[in-house]
């Protein structure tokens, strides 16, 4: 295996495993992606296709900044305070980066991950262990 040709990595979210009343639609679609990836891994595993899901937690992205802005507007607060407060809720004390998520995807597409299939891996700074 030289590249991520036979492997498939689906990007879901920790919201797919940990329900949040404010994210019902988002969480439901991400949960469906987790289930689909597990089913596809079973179906195509005998063909040598490895399928996994990556579940990012709080990752500092433009999408999260938009969400933080909406939360701040709804509560009469500041977007910066929402971001700071949520980052503090992560056991490692900060948001993750898109590069950290990409590093996991790169690993899953490498020979080192040739026996990993049908699983969901969280990239969330330990937050899932505290939910």
Q: What is each PLM-predicted segment?
A:
Residues 29, 37:
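Active-site helix of classical SDR
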């Amino acid at each position: 295996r030289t590249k991520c040709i036979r492997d498939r990595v689906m990007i879901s979210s920790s919201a797919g495993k940990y329900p949040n009343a404010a994210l019902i639609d988002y969480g439901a679609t991400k949960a469906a992606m987790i289930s689909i990836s597990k089913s596809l891994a079973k179906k195509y595993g005998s063909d040598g296709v490895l399928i996994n899901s990556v579940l990012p937690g709080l990752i500092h992205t433009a999408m999260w900044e938009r969400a933080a802005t909406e939360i701040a507007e709804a509560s009469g607060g500041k977007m910066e305070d929402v971001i700071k407060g949520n980052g503090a809720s992560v056991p490692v004390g900060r948001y993750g980066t898109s590069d950290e998520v990409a590093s996991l995807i790169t690993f899953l597409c490498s020979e080192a991950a040739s026996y990993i299939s049908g699983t969901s891996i969280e990239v969330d700074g330990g937050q899932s262990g505290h939910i």
